[in-house]
Amino acid sequence: MSEAAIAKKAEIVKQTTDMLNAAQSAIVVDYRGLTVAEVTDLRKQLRDAGIQMSVIKNKILDRAVEGTDYEDLRSTFVGPTAVAFSDEDPIAPAKILKKFADDHDALEIKGGFIEKSVKTLDEINEYANMPGREELLSMLASALQDPMRKIARAVKAIADKEDEAA
């Protein structure tokens, strides 16, 4: 192999390592059996959520995780491999990919990491079933508003009772 080709591959490995290190989460999938239209639809869904999906050679991924906390992912680098990276919402890739995999049997989630910690397939599925950040904030706001509503109703009831008595 020429020196230029080796340098190019080393740069690709470095870029992949940088993407892994910068990501809040990365989910490894096998996309074998998906049609071009299905892959395009999946990429669009991921892109709309701010997630980048890249098809990366297994050997490059293997070298990119070498010496990192993600070495346990090496066993997932078999067959056609794509990786969905998220820099913002660590749960979003798991949610979108699980939903897509439920609708398309050909997509298989193989593993990944969430918030810098390698997760098993079962753990990724648990995360995927959790409410998203926006849903959790909405639930929190509702929980905080409920006691205030009760107090407001009680104060209003007392005021109405005093108005009737007067």
Curated annotation (Swiss-Prot):
A GO MF label: structural constituent of ribosome
SUPFAM superfamilies given in the database record: Ribosomal protein L10-like
Gene3D superfamilies assigned to the protein according to its UniProt record, in alphabetical order: 3.30.70.1730
GO annotation terms (biological process): translation
A Pfam match: Ribosomal_L10
Function: Forms part of the ribosomal stalk, playing a central role in the interaction of the ribosome with GTP-bound translation factors.
UniProt protein name: Large ribosomal subunit protein uL10
Provenance organism: Limosilactobacillus reuteri (strain DSM 20016)
